[in-house]
Structure formats: structure tokens, C-alpha cells
Swiss-Prot record:
It comes from Pseudomonas paraeruginosa (strain DSM 24068 / PA7). This is Thiazole synthase. It is an enzyme of class 2 (transferase). Keywords: Cytoplasm, Schiff base, Thiamine biosynthesis, Transferase. 1-deoxy-D-xylulose 5-phosphate binds at G168, A194, G195, N216, T217. One of its GO terms (molecular function) is thiazole synthase activity. The lineage of its organism: Bacteria, Pseudomonadati, Pseudomonadota, Gammaproteobacteria, Pseudomonadales.
Length: 265
């Protein structure tokens, strides 16, 4: 990643340019109406959906999430949440492509266990390689290991999405130093995925130089999800602007704001 300039560059995923750098999930809301209102307040244009946990057409007799997040308004990003090996993940992506009429953009996540929800990077690499061969545009959830992030980009993933903290933990940016290394080496967009708990966490991720942030629980489990969604929208914008502006250097000692020359006695 090159050093920031004061001129912004577009946020492009799979050849499409987006105005919002906030991506949101659809789980954990109390009902579909709250889901709709929070997503609208967030200003997000990309919305991720857990194919194995959400009805997007595979169950005709049940409420369809796509009725409240219509694909003509949002880019639907099907994800493989709940998959624990490469075979499951690939199968889920193929199902999503069938349900969404040939839609190739997917978010790959292969989990290691139910307690930590850490990514299983071995299975993630296997699944990513197969999905890229199958013609999918793969955005991939991964650890904050810079080597794994590099390998996923080399395989052909169009974006790498390292965790900032455990999924659903709200712990914030636990290891900014690894994220900085990933960002310095990045040849594809880097998005923080998981760990964000409040607006300041999102701003920090953007100040580090991430292209975007994906979140769900931070909004859905807030006391007022719709208000938090709006807060996150502004945090993403503020963080990006701060990154482009360039923060002042950190100093050990004070530095007076006003010059000492010409002081009135």
C-alpha cells in the first residue's frame, strides 16, 4: 500500500465503484424491519448475507431477506458463515450463485471452531483456490497473519479481510501492527472484518489505511442499532479523511501552538 495522499482513490470491488466504505451484515437484528432501517441508516451499498442461515430464496414459504435488501438497490455479498471446511464453503458459494442468478461475488470464511470463530487458514486457502478456479470473485475473511494475507492475494482473491478482533467480540483493533504490515504489502483492497465494537474502532481501522470496514454485531447489538449504524457511517468517513490528511507526528514533549517571538511583556 502506497503512502496516503490528500487525493482519495475510489473504492472498487470486482470492477464496480462504491461510494460507501462501510459494509454491513444482516444477522442478529430483532426483526427484518430493524434490519432494513439499520442498513438504510448505515449508507452501506454492500450487504453480506449468511447463505446457510438466511433465506434468500431457498425456502419459498419463509420470509425472504431480499425483500428488505433488494438486489437492485444493494450489492448482495453471500458469505459462507457456518462452514468449517473447504468442501462446505465451496458448496455454499455454488448454491449462492444459483440462488442469485449467476452472481459471482462472495465472501469466503472457513472457521476453525465454534468457540473462537478464528479462520481455519489451511481450509481457507484450499477453498479460495478452488473458488477462484470456478470464476468467483472472492473476498476472504482471514487472520491478521501478513503471510496468509499475501498468499490469499496471490491465489487471486480480490480483497483480503483480516480480523481486528474475534467475531462478535467488540474488542476493537487488537493488533494494529499486523494490520499495518498487511496494508504495506497489499496488492488488493484490505478491509477489516470482525472485532469492531463502536464508532472509534471503525475510525481507527480507516486511519490505518484500510479500504473499508465490514461489521454486523457492533450495529445489531447496540442499544439503538439504527443510531449506531449512522454513527458508523460518519466514523468511516472521518477515519478515511484523517488517513488522507495525515496525522501530526507524535512527540514526547510539548510544543506550543503560538510562537514565542514578539511576546508582550
Amino acid at each position: 500500500m502506497s503512502q496516503a495522499s490528500s487525493t482519495d482513490t475510489p473504492f472498487v470491488i470486482a470492477g464496480r465503484t462504491y461510494g460507501s466504505r462501510l459494509l454491513v451484515g444482516t444477522g442478529k437484528y430483532k426483526d427484518l424491519d430493524e434490519t432494513r432501517r439499520a442498513i438504510e441508516a448505515s449508507g452501506a451499498e454492500i450487504v453480506t448475507v449468511a447463505v446457510r442461515r438466511t433465506n434468500i430464496g431457498q425456502n419459498p414459504g419463509e420470509p425472504n431477506l431480499l425483500d428488505v435488501i433488494p438486489p437492485d438497490r444493494y450489492t448482495i455479498l453471500p458469505n459462507t458463515a457456518g462452514c468449517y471446511d473447504a468442501v462446505e464453503a465451496v458448496r455454499t458459494c455454488r448454491l449462492a450463485r444459483e440462488l442469485l442468478d449467476g452472481h459471482n461475488l462472495v465472501k469466503l470464511e472457513v472457521l476453525a471452531d465454534q468457540k473462537t470463530l478464528f479462520p481455519n487458514v489451511v481450509e481457507t486457502l484450499k477453498a479460495a483456490e478452488q473458488l477462484v478456479k470456478d470464476g468467483f470473485d472472492v473476498m476472504v475473511y482471514t487472520s491478521d497473519d501478513p503471510i496468509i494475507a499475501r498468499q490469499l492475494a496471490e491465489i487471486g482473491c480480490i480483497a483480503v479481510m483480516p480480523l481486528a478482533g474475534l467475531i462478535g467480540s467488540g474488542l476493537g483493533i487488537c493488533n494494529p501492527y499486523n494490520l499495518r504490515i498487511i496494508l504495506e504489502e497489499a496488492k488488493v483492497p484490505v478491509l477489516v472484518d470482525a472485532g469492531v465494537g463502536t464508532a472509534s474502532d471503525a475510525a481507527i481501522a480507516m486511519e490505518l489505511g484500510c479500504e473499508a470496514v465490514l461489521m454486523n454485531t457492533a450495529i445489531a447489538h447496540a442499544r439503538d442499532p439504527v443510531m449506531m449504524a449512522e454513527a458508523m457511517k460518519h466514523a468511516i468517513v472521518a477515519g478515511r479523511l484523517a488517513y488522507l490528511a495525515g496525522r501530526m507526528p507524535r512527540k514526547l514533549y510539548a510544543s506550543a501552538s503560538s510562537p514565542l517571538d514578539g511576546l508582550i511583556d
